[in-house]
Amino acid sequence: MSAGKRSAAGSARSDTATSTVDLHASLLPLAFLVGTWRGEGVGGYEGLDGFHYGQEITFAADGRPALGYVSHTWWADEPRDGREPGSPLATETGFWRVQPGEDGKPVVEVMLAHPFGIAEIYVGTVTGTRIDLDHNVLIRTATARDVTRSVRLYGLVEGCDLAYAIDMEAEGKPMQSHLSARLHRVSD
């Protein structure tokens, strides 16, 4: 990837193999995420039967120093527990941004909100096309489930698919695998 012209707004054109979008210069380490991704994943947790889900994630750049982020998931298993294939499961919205770290390496900050009463801030690192995130702050409403910590790993696999894994500590149970998926790019 190469950074091209800079505009007066402080953004750079990111010339990637899959997209050319107005991308703020601070977001160049995340340029590989920009676009819409779609695929399938598996989920589970202690006390919860395993399940399959479909997902679409969009990372959008508009020239400002944060990527907009929206994720939608839907049931992709046989009918169970009142769920039918295609019925909505979860939504996340938020922003991803990059700040300079004390050691000069980029620090990724992710702010997410969920309709079930949780807002999260993750802080982590980006190394090439791998992003490691750990909870920095988690805020819950009085009626939200008792999630206490989460870690996420995102990265490109086999050159072009976006894969991730989310581990979670909740309801007094230890940190364990919760969700993982592999998504392919469907648009820039």
Curated annotation (Swiss-Prot):
Forms a 10-stranded antiparallel beta-barrel structure able to accommodate a hydrophobic ligand in its interior. In fact, this fold hosts the heme group, which is located in a wide surface cleft. It comes from the Bacteria. Keywords: Heme, Iron, Isomerase, Metal-binding. Gene3D superfamilies: 2.40.128.20. The keyword Ubl conjugation does not apply. CDD domains: lipocalin_heme-bd-THAP4-like. It catalyses: peroxynitrite = nitrate. The lineage of its organism: Bacteria, Bacillati, Actinomycetota, Actinomycetes, Frankiales. Homodimer. One of its GO terms (molecular function) is heme binding. InterPro entries: Calycin, Nb(III)_bact/plant, Nitrobindin, THAP4-like_heme-bd. Its EC number is 5.99.-.-. Pathway: Nitrogen metabolism. SUPFAM superfamilies: Lipocalins. Pfam families: THAP4_heme-bd. It is an enzyme of class 5 (isomerase). Belongs to the nitrobindin family. Heme b binds at H178. Binds 1 heme b group per subunit, that coordinates a highly solvent-exposed Fe(III) atom. A motif (GXWXGXG) lies at residues 35-41. This is Peroxynitrite isomerase. Heme-binding protein able to scavenge peroxynitrite and to protect free L-tyrosine against peroxynitrite-mediated nitration, by acting as a peroxynitrite isomerase that converts peroxynitrite to nitrate. Therefore, this protein likely plays a role in peroxynitrite sensing and in the detoxification of reactive nitrogen and oxygen species (RNS and ROS, respectively). Is able to bind nitric oxide (NO) in vitro, but may act as a sensor of peroxynitrite levels in vivo. Its cofactor is heme b.
